[in-house]
């Protein structure tokens, strides 16, 4: 399989270099998959040769991901990858997990030495990947990004199957603005700094606060996706006596930790209460909290990218970028069907 891939890589790279990766915002005439099937929009069409298992050899893939214990989203994402990249489906898969960019890059170098056919990467951080991707290119190894974008030339990877994190953040901020508060005092709990999820979700809020005189950030601090750390951050703000009426947490786990601190201090939260709660990912348990009125808004982040990667490997990259279709949910309008259909 390795020799076969090396024969194909030249034409693949020529095709990939012919097209710039499209911006994550906007649909550009893209099609959408049914909502029950991890929906996606696609942009920037480009053809690439398909891989095959006709020789009887397994396709060797090195999969670099964030820690599955990071969040419910990541657990679902890892499960999806493991259920797809199996021997029965034609793959020999090796997995590496870390929340640190430098560890992930070192793992990529090791996978290159192991002569994998494909590197599948969900990057912990957006920067620093050019060198190792150049190494992969020289070795004839194809790279597919999933879940998160990186700052690297598009000719260094075959395709990108990602969430539009900036759009997720903008949808949440637009919803918050629509609530018509006279004053917004926001406690902002961030994810791992430098990740595309943090950059996108933080960026929308930062821009709104800069533009509006009645929007204020009371506290902005990373909890690195941790429920426990988020609880500690909120508890410290409560203890300081600083007033806030919005918690903008960049994932569900951190929102859960924030709510635990509010409950401990007997501060009401949710629909019609003292503090608005915003989370991201749409874990099933979080959507149930939303439906119960304990939270106010949850932004979807779709973790089911594996089938798109499998299709690209076996049938060729028909587009450079696949953007997962995602929406936000309001406690006042979410239904039991939404919880069942979109909860992860």
Per-region residue spans from a language model:
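Hydrophobic alpha-helical
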Residues: 105, 112-138, 205, 219, ...
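Flexible loop/hinge segments that line or gate small-molecule binding clefts
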Residues: 127-167, 282-291
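Short, low-complexity disordered leader/linker segments with a strong preference
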Residues: 1-60, 134-141, 340-344
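Short, solvent-exposed amphipathic alpha-helices that sit
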Residues: 72-91, 168-172, 196-215, 229, ...
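Extracytoplasmic "Venus flytrap"
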Residues: 60-88, 94-110, 122-127, 190-200, ...
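Hydrophobic alpha-helical segments within soluble ligand-binding/sensing domains
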Residues: 57, 61, 104, 160-185, ...
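Hinge/cleft segment of the Venus flytrap/periplasmic-binding protein
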Residues: 51, 57-59, 189, 193-197, ...
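Short beta-strand elements at the ligand-binding edges of bilobed clamshell
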Residues: 95-97, 152-175, 188-190, 220, ...
């Amino acid at each position: 399989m390795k020799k076969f891939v090396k024969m194909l890589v030249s034409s693949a790279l020529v095709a990939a270099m012919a097209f710039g990766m499209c911006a994550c915002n906007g649909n550009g005439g893209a099609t959408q998959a049914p909502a029950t099937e991890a929906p996606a929009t696609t942009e920037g069409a480009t053809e690439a040769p398909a891989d095959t298992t006709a020789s009887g050899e397994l396709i060797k893939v090195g999969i670099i991901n964030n820690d599955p214990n990071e969040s419910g989203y990541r657990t679902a994402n890892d499960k999806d990858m493991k259920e797809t990249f199996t021997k029965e489906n034609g793959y020999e898969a090796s997995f590496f997990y870390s929340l640190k960019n430098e560890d992930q890059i070192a793992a990529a170098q090791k996978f290159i030495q192991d002569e994998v056919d494909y590197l599948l990467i969900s990057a912990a951080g957006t920067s620093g990947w050019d060198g190792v991707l150049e190494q992969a290119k020289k070795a004839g190894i194809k790279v597919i990004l999933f879940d998160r974008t990186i700052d690297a030339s598009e000719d260094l990877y075959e395709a990108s199957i990602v969430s539009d994190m900036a759009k997720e953040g903008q949808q949440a901020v637009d919803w918050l603005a629509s609530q018509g508060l006279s004053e917004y005092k926001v406690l902002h709990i961030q994810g791992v700094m430098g990740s595309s999820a943090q950059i996108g979700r933080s960026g929308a809020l930062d821009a709104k606060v800069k533009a509006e005189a009645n929007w204020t950030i009371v506290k902005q601090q990373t909890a690195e996706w941790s429920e426990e750390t988020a609880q500690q951050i909120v508890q410290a703000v409560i203890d300081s006596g600083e007033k806030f009426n919005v918690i903008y947490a960049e994932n569900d786990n951190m929102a859960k930790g924030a709510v635990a601190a509010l409950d401990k201090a007997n501060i009401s939260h949710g629909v019609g209460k003292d503090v608005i709660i915003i989370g991201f990912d749409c874990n099933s348990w979080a959507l149930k909290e939303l439906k119960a009125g304990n939270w106010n808004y949850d932004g979807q982040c779709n973790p089911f990218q594996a089938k798109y990667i499998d299709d690209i490997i076996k049938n060729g990259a028909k587009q450079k970028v696949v953007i997962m279709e995602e929406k936000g949910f309001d406690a006042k309008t979410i239904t039991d069907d939404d919880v069942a259909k979109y909860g992860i």
